[in-house]
UniProtKB/Swiss-Prot annotation:
InterPro entries: Chitin_Synth_Reg, Sel1-like, TPR-like_helical_dom_sf
UniProt source species: Saccharomyces cerevisiae (strain ATCC 204508 / S288c)
Entry annotated with the keyword Cell wall biogenesis/degradation: yes
Tagged with keyword Repeat: yes
Gene symbol of the encoding locus: SHC1
Name listed for the protein in its UniProt record: Protein SHC1
Induction of expression: During sporulation and at high pH.
GO BP terms in the entry: ascospore formation; chitin biosynthetic process; fungal-type cell wall organization
Disulphides: none
Length: 512
């Protein structure tokens, strides 16, 4: 038994390979000593002649044994399924993949039954591999049974707890097929205010966004580079950018590819919200008769993106459902429609779109488009946090440590919140810059004998939060510099922020 580690496999899962002495002899006799994957034709013939003779001998032994058994127990009692033929064994042999497709050995195995058997066996193998991969993704576990968190951090606090998402019963997306949106009870806004949220796939295009890096974005940058190198005199020979966008849209709309349509809708929505790019496109269209103004071009692009996103959302594409819900909640199409955003977020959350799971939790927490429900908000936050969502880890850590959103104020819950804040701090960014600040407040005072006070580490966490853009941490560092490095350990800001009087606690319980 030999143990090898495949470096190309994500997570470096151990791969166990076992081989016997017969395989070693075949490899040493049939293959070149330089490489087992580079075969010369004489070596191939020699190898396959030895293999075929070995298989044929084993087949003769099997037929002789079969005749003896059939003579003793009768022909009818024998199994109907015969032994695998030489062709079947040849097609199922693992080293068959090494040979080229147009090899002379294929002339011996052109039987229809063998080819159909080969296709079935390959199809079943592909289905098994795909099912294993999908089960690993859904379960969040690696091939060796370990959790995905074991690669870089300690397991989450609620790893062993089963988290089941509960969705509202009135998840109605009829407005996707109703452009006017008139008179539907689902279209009523329970809250007309929007909320500034950290999101991985957002409409804030000033921040690097992996999902917004489409092929058309790259083409736009290449177009600018070409214009720069051509100069002012020769740039007229280059096709205007607006023409290329129109041509790209015509081709995409004729196709039935969902991802291509989503990329196009995302790009034109990005262009429609970028004032600088709109002015560049308007300047290119000044010489034409059907020139647009900035406002009319923006309205045209945004409405076109809205139509495409509605069609994709109606067929259940989760990325389109999230982006359309984000546009509704941000007021891109005019009035803020939180009810529609909530329905789209919850629909995408059913399809395991993690950012939509987090946004659904925010809707339940703040009452955006739905009645406030603290248990459901915590439920969705917990699910998103177990899937490595930084903002969900941060919020769940704060709520657990300070006993908010109906969570118990006991030691176990506090320690769970402390662990969630540690995990959120390890993944902190400019979007989630409050996690190091909250963890620093905990280390500044400590908690009983479970969390030892460490002011030096707390100051390092304040510096990390301030570098990410947290203003309160920057203020604390400035006060510490003025006082000669001394920071008060009595009442950290978070303790004052989340401290509740008895009347406030009673009101919060009634609300929950």
């Amino acid at each position: 038994m030999s143990m090898t580690i495949c470096s190309n496999t994500p997570g470096a899962y151990p791969e166990i390979g076992a081989y016997n002495e017969v395989d070693k002899q075949l490899e040493s006799s049939g293959f070149s000593s330089d490489s087992s994957l580079i075969l010369n034709k004489p070596e191939v013939r020699q190898y396959w002649s030895s293999v075929s003779s070995h298989i044929s001998r084993s087949g003769d032994v099997f037929t002789n044994d079969k005749e003896k058994i059939s003579s003793s127990i009768g022909e009818d009692a024998m199994d109907i399924d015969a032994s695998p033929s030489l062709i079947e064994k040849y097609n199922s042999f693992p080293t068959r993949k090494i040979l080229p497709e147009q090899d002379e050995f294929e002339n011996d195995v052109e039987d229809d039954a063998s080819s159909s058997l080969k296709e079935k066996s390959q199809g079943s193998c592909e289905i098994e591999i795909a099912s294993e991969i999908s089960s690993e993704i859904l379960n969040g576990t690696s091939a060796d049974g370990n959790s995905e968190f074991h690669d870089f951090a300690e397991p989450p606090p609620s790893q062993n707890e089963s988290v089941a998402l509960s969705f509202s019963q009135s998840n109605d997306l009829d407005f996707l097929n109703n452009p006017s949106g008139s008179g539907s009870s689902n279209d009523i806004n329970r809250s007309t205010s929007s909320i500034s949220l950290p999101r991985h796939v957002s409409l804030d295009f000033n921040v690097y966004n992996s999902l917004c890096l489409t092929n058309e974005v790259t083409a736009s940058e290449s177009h600018n580079v070409a214009k720069f190198h051509l100069g002012k005199k020769n740039k007229k020979s280059l096709l205007p950018r607006w023409k290329t966008i129109e041509m790209y849209g015509e081709v995409v709309k004729k196709t039935q590819d969902i991802y291509s349509n989503f990329q196009y809708a995302q790009y034109i929505l990005r262009v429609g919200l970028d004032t600088e790019k709109l002015h560049e496109l308007v300047k290119e269209l000044e010489d034409e008769s059907n020139s647009f103004s900035v406002d009319s071009l923006k309205e045209y692009l945004v409405n076109d993106a809205k139509v495409i996103l509605k069609k994709l959302s109606a067929v259940g594409y989760p990325d389109a459902q999230y982006l359309l819900g984000d546009a509704y909640s941000s007021g891109v199409f005019g009035k803020i429609k939180n009810r529609r955003a909530f329905l789209l977020f919850s629909a995408a959350a059913k399809r395991m779109h993690i950012e939509s799971v987090y946004r659904t939790a925010i809707c339940y927490e703040c009452g955006l488009g739905v009645t406030r429900n603290a248990p459901k908000a915590v439920n969705f936050l917990t699910f998103a946090a177990t899937k490595n969502h930084p903002a969900a880890m941060y919020k769940l850590g704060v709520y657990s440590y300070h006993g908010l959103m109906g969570l118990p104020d006991d030691i176990l819950t506090k320690m769970d919140g402390y662990r969630w804040l540690r995990r959120a701090t390890s993944m902190a960014s400019s979007f989630v810059c409050g996690a190091p600040f909250e963890l620093a407040n905990i280390y500044m005072t400590g908690y009983k004998d479970l969390i030892i006070s460490d002011p030096d580490y707390a100051m390092a966490l304040y510096e990390k939060a301030a570098a990410l853009g947290h203003t309160e941490s920057a203020r604390i560092l400035e006060d510490a510099r003025r006082s000669g490095g001394f920071v008060s350990r009595g009442h950290p800001p978070s303790a004052q922020k989340y401290h509740k009087t008895s009347h406030e606690a009673v009101a919060a319980k009634k609300l929950i």
